């Protein structure tokens, strides 16, 4: 059951299940996006970098974070728009085989007319060690609860 704007109170914490990033994820994302930078696609090259191995695309990890939240079905029937992202930072690499999950905290709510509201989340993607690998603030435009007549 989807949540309405009014149900997103300040400091509400939402957490997803984990998802392991696979070789197939990285290869598929390279093909889909056209991002064949060797850090993502060339084992031998990646060994010469400070990471010592290939890393997942940052945009892949962001996309996975959106997917993990979508699977929770929190706003499937009430979301009106993905309004934007601010302050995005990739803080640690994600390696093939790492498992990521998302923790979001409601940091702002703003009514936007009678039928909708804007919710701002402080979002963190965490690896299997609990380390933040990606941090950002995202905004969703969500339906307000219909008034009863």
Listing of model-derived features with the role each one plays in the protein:
Residues 1-56, 143-144:
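Catalytic strand-loop segment that frames the active site of acyl-thioester-processing enzymes
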Residues 31-35, 67-74, 128:
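Short, intrinsically disordered, mixed-charge
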Residues 38-40, 51, 80, 85-87, ...:
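Short, intrinsically disordered/low-complexity patches at protein termini
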């Amino acid at each position: 059951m989807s949540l309405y704007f009014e149900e997103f109170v300040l400091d509400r914490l939402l957490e997803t299940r984990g998802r392991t990033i696979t070789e197939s994820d990285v290869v598929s994302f390279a093909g889909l996006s056209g991002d064949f930078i060797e850090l993502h696609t060339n084992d031998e090259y990646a060994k010469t970098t400070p990471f010592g191995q290939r890393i997942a695309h940052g945009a892949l990890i962001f996309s996975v974070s959106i997917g993990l939240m979508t699977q929770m079905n929190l706003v499937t029937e009430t979301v009106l728009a993905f309004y934007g992202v601010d302050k995005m930072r990739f803080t640690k690499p994600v390696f093939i085989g790492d498992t990521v999950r998302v923790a979001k905290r409601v940091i702002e709510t703003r009514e936007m007319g009678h039928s909708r509201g804007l919710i701002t989340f402080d979002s963190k993607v965490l690896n299997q060690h609990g380390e933040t690998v990606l941090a950002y603030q995202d905004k969703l435009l969500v339906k307000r609860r219909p008034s009863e007549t």
